[in-house]
């Protein structure tokens, strides 16, 4: 249930208006009646004035009984459905749903062009036009913040940091030694630009290595809550354009993340490894240091990568192996356990 405490419903919307809004990502759709659509709901909860979506075939059975006025479905969907539900076919129904959410809802909380009195901003800092600077924000010397940016309460931005236009930086974020592009979102509690875990050991003494690199983050990047991105020791840590990084991810010093890559929660990437473009790392994946992971690589959840991976490979397990080998290993292990248990019973 969508709470009106936090989100504003922009509806009702005419069904024809919805179809027109999504026209470039859906198939042409004919309707018999142009009704008001009040909300977006899951198939099981939708009423005759709601729209829904289907992206996971596990839920296709609910299309037979749903009361939804309309439903966005995959392009090739041909299964039985409620005759009263208008089916809107899309190449990617989940992507269409993500666009529809923007058409129906907006956050209640809004940010005016304002600098709160409790914010501490150095005289040499340059704040762009139409920015919001929240309570207890600290912005140090020579910081540059682009136009239309939001810096929310309790955030710290260290000396010399450069942040592009249209940034949204949420509460209690800290940013040091970083250059950040346009249209970047950094969620609550993320830490960027701190020292990496670098020590030189001699006779039991761990001598800390002074890190003189920075963090470079491209355009249209999202970084999740409590994620940490260390600055480089010599080489910079680089996050290229269009990356999506989930909560609680650790990115070590000197790591490079290629354009459009996705990294899911609790993954960790050790120092100086390079992740290619459009890669996907599942939850709790671990990448050892000084490795090269090819473009469009996928690593299944909890995979442990200890060697280089060629472009386009799908791997899983720890140590990570080709995904089909991992499945075979899992089957063999189950068979061994079953055989062993049978012998013990005898």
UniProtKB/Swiss-Prot annotation:
Q: Name one GO molecular function term.
A: N-acyltransferase activity
Can you cite a GO biological process for this protein? lipid A biosynthetic process
Pfam families given for it? Hexapep (PF00132), LpxD (PF04613)
Cite the entry's keywords alphabetically: Acyltransferase, Lipid A biosynthesis, Lipid biosynthesis, Lipid metabolism, Repeat, Transferase
Q: Which SUPFAM superfamilies match?
A: Trimeric LpxA-like enzymes
Substrates-to-products reaction catalysed: a UDP-3-O-[(3R)-3-hydroxyacyl]-alpha-D-glucosamine + a (3R)-hydroxyacyl-[ACP] = a UDP-2-N,3-O-bis[(3R)-3-hydroxyacyl]-alpha-D-glucosamine + holo-[ACP] + H(+)
Work out whether the entry's keyword set contains Lipid biosynthesis.
yes
The source's superkingdom equals Bacteria
Family annotation (CDD domains): LbH_LpxD
Give its E.C. classification number.
Answer: 2.3.1.191
Question: Which cellular component appears as one GO term in the record?
Answer: membrane
Q: Give the metabolic or biological pathway.
A: Bacterial outer membrane biogenesis; LPS lipid A biosynthesis
Active site as annotated: 253 (proton acceptor)
Looking at the keywords, is Repeat present? yes
What family does the Swiss-Prot or TrEMBL record give for this protein? Belongs to the transferase hexapeptide repeat family. LpxD subfamily.
Q: Describe the protein's quaternary organization and the partners it interacts with.
A: Homotrimer.
Biological function: Catalyzes the N-acylation of UDP-3-O-acylglucosamine using 3-hydroxyacyl-ACP as the acyl donor. Is involved in the biosynthesis of lipid A, a phosphorylated glycolipid that anchors the lipopolysaccharide to the outer membrane of the cell.
Q: What name goes with this protein?
A: UDP-3-O-acylglucosamine N-acyltransferase
């Amino acid at each position: 249930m969508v709470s009106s405490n936090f989100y504003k419903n922009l509806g009702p919307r005419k069904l024809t208006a919805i179809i027109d809004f999504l026209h470039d990502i859906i198939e042409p759709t004919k309707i018999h009646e142009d009704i008001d659509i009040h909300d977006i709901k899951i198939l099981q909860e939708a009423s005759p004035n709601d729209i829904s979506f289907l992206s996971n075939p596990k839920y296709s059975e609910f299309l037979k009984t749903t009361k939804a006025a309309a439903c966005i479905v995959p392009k090739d969907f041909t299964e039985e459905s409620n005759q009263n539900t208008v089916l809107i076919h899309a190449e990617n129904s989940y992507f269409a749903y993500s666009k529809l959410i923007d058409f129906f809802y907006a956050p209640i909380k809004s940010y005016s062009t304002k600098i709160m009195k409790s914010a501490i901003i150095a005289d040499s800092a340059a704040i762009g036009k139409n920015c919001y600077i929240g309570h207890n924000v600290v912005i140090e010397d020579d910081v540059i913040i682009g136009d239309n940016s939001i810096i929310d309460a309790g955030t710290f931005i260290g000396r010399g940091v450069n942040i592009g236009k249209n940034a949204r930086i949420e509460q209690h974020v800290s940013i040091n030694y970083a250059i950040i592009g346009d249209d970047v979102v950094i969620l609550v509690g993320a830490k960027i630009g701190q020292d990496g875990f670098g020590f030189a050991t001699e006779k039991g003494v761990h001598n800390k290595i002074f890190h003189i690199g920075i963090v470079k983050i491209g355009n249209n990047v999202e970084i999740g809550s409590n994620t940490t991105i260390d600055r480089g020791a010599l080489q910079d840590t680089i996050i290229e354009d269009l990356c999506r990084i989930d909560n609680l991810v650790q990115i070590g010093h000197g790591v490079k993340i290629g354009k459009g890559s996705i990294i899911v929660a609790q993954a960790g990437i050790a120092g100086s490894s390079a992740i290619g473009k459009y890669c996907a790392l599942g939850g709790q994946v671990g990448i050892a240091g000084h490795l090269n992971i090819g473009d469009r690589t996928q690593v299944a959840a909890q995979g442990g990568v200890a060697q280089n991976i060629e472009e386009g490979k799908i791997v899983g397990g720890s140590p990570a192996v080709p995904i089909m080998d991992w499945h075979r290993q899992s089957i063999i292990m189950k068979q061994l356990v079953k055989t062993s248990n049978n012998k013990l019973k005898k």
